[in-house]
Amino acid sequence: MVTSLNEDSESITVEWIENGDTKGKEIDLESIFSLNHDLAPDEEIDPGPEMPPPPAPTTKVNKIVKNRRTVAPVKNETPAKDNRVAAVGSARARPIQPIEQSASRQQNGSVSDISPDQPGKKDFGLASRRKSNCVKEVEKLQEKRERRRLQQQELREKKAQDFDATNPNYEIMCMIKDFRGSLDYRPLTTSDPIDEHRICVCVRKRPLNKKETTIKDLDVITIPIKDVVMVHEPKQKVDLTRFLENQTFRFDYAFDETAPNETVYRFTARPLVETIFERGMATCFAYGQTGSGKTHTMGGDFSGKNQDCSKGIYALAARDVFQMLKKPNYKKLELQVYATFFEIYSGKVFDLLNRKTKLRVLEDGKQQVQVVGLQEREVKCVEDVLKLIEIGNSCRTSGQTSANAHSSRSHAVFQIILRKKGKMHGKFSLIDLAGNERGADTSSADRQTRLEGAEINKSLLALKECIRALGRNKPHTPFRASKLTQVLRDSFIGENSRTCMIATISPGMASCENTLNTLRYANRVKELDPSRCRRPPPHDTSCPQTSWMTWKQCGEWGVAPQRDDLKLLCEQNEEEVSPQLFTFHEAVSQMVEMEEQVVEDHRAVFPGTSIRWLEGLKKCLLEMTEEVDYDADSYATQLEAILEKKIDILTELRDKVKSFRAALQEEEHASKQINPKRPRAL
């Protein structure tokens, strides 16, 4: 039934009952009249004085017909639109039929059907003007939808131009591009202030290299602001749908792939130079995966296997040291500059400036660590430093890996030492660490690879704990846990000690796991959370000295300080060091100690004692036998005593060799007991 008549909109409102529910609808009068011709009022055409001229000639008619045909496609689209409206419940799907019939008559060429006022066109205008509000809203939504689809199509075409659609990771590449487009970039610039840190941890990202570009690897690292690093880790759901897991880390500084060595040095190592002039100890580490840019950062640019040492942090630090020596307040101190360069490989120390001579690391009665036999070269200028760096780099232990054709396999330590009248005034240690992914090679079938990986793993764990102890002023620093931290003991002990770590990362998706491990390691050193409210782990609240004394009193490890520190180190890193891995580290440490003792006794017995034996026979016993009336009883007694002494020495050496062989077998057995699901590499 009709409930109301709306004169303004020329429509009526009707209601009816359907299945017990009252329903309503608004219908315009034109639709009603088009369906019920008997109800339509008679239209009178008033021929006024403004009547248009008579019909034009045939050529004119043809032109009008042509113009009408160009509008036809628009009319053909109208029913489709009205059908969609009818599906929603509108009753405006049919008023177009009279117009279409009128248009068809005009297309047939009947001139008499074309009235002066063109009523068909007038009806079409009224129909479009009298659409209901519901239809208008639907048409607006349709226009927005079509406009949005057009924009999406243009965006897809633009992306197709920017990216290579043949890349197998094209989908991930588009996700990363979309995510980066939503970020606000504020990268680090040279105008930013330099903050003072006792412990500075920063990250440097290198660009994609030629190998990664050739295999179409993706850049999954983003550095939006000066202290934040984001990793876009590709993952896959159970239904094989790929997605990104974006992980955020915060450090003191973050350098993108465009930052040169000079910029990195300005914010990291340069603030430490003044420390050594103030009787302090400064340390700068380069840490990361093989091929991530550690040696490039510390030593300089590479051109194949040739390195430009003048652009590395080694040379830049030496340049500033000599510049500060010219300042009046330091010039009067009459300081002398010395340099040393050595490497630590598989727990052994080698002098890179003295034909890789093997050195011994000892601790004197004052608990001062001494590297016996290490050469210190006096340097007068930066050119002298560059020559020493070239000599050391040329003989550093390296090898070919899947990541790098010239990969460093040892920790290289370059030290700039200031001395005043022979006494140490300050020391700056610059360390290029070995690749952290080698720490996972602790279960290799090759013993040398196992020892190499075990030493790297242990030294990196010890380094992390020593830096944490320095930053938190802990009463005990486990520097004896590894040879690296033992040599650098002075850098972790004392109030005037400062440390900087440069974590270098590879941007490629293939290196994503190692990159995350590097960032997690660097994050644990200082623990700067993006939310700036992270609390220290629970185990840090306990006093390490108490635990160390407890183990010592229990007698589990005897009195060896290095074993106590190793135990402490593994206890503080339970999530990274399994019990089997700890047993393996213990076996390796014992084996290395036995090896040093055997080699030392071997050198003492055969070259030295044999010469004394021959000299003693020549001067004493053999000369005695040349006499006519020599005392044969005395000769036999002395010879027997010398032989017994010699036998005792050789027996002791033989026992040590047996113990060394047992240690080798124990290391072999321990390496096989490591859980295959071992902790990730540092």
From Swiss-Prot:
Regions of compositional bias (Polar residues) in chain numbering: 99-115
Subcellular location, record wording: Cytoplasm; Cytoplasm, Cytoskeleton, Microtubule organizing center, Centrosome; Cytoplasm, Cytoskeleton, Spindle pole; Cytoplasm, Cytoskeleton, Spindle
SMART domains noted in UniProt: KISc
Post-translational modification: Phosphorylation by plk1 promotes location at spindle microtubules and spindle poles, and enhances its microtubule depolymerization activity.
Highest rank taxon of the organism: Eukaryota
UniProt signal peptide: none
An individual GO BP term: microtubule depolymerization
Matching InterPro entries: KIF2A-like_N, Kinesin-like_fam, Kinesin_motor_CS, Kinesin_motor_dom, Kinesin_motor_dom_sf, P-loop_NTPase
Ranges where the Kinesin motor domain occurs: 198-528
Residues given in the record as ATP binding sites: G288, Q289, T290, G291, S292, G293, K294, T295
Record-linked PROSITE patterns: KINESIN_MOTOR_1, KINESIN_MOTOR_2
One Gene Ontology cellular component: microtubule
Protein's job: Plus end-directed microtubule-dependent motor. May regulate microtubule dynamics during axonal growth. Required for normal progression through mitosis. Required for normal congress of chromosomes at the metaphase plate. Required for normal spindle dynamics during mitosis. Promotes spindle turnover. Implicated in formation of bipolar mitotic spindles Has microtubule depolymerization activity.
Protein name: Kinesin-like protein KIF2A
Organism: Xenopus laevis
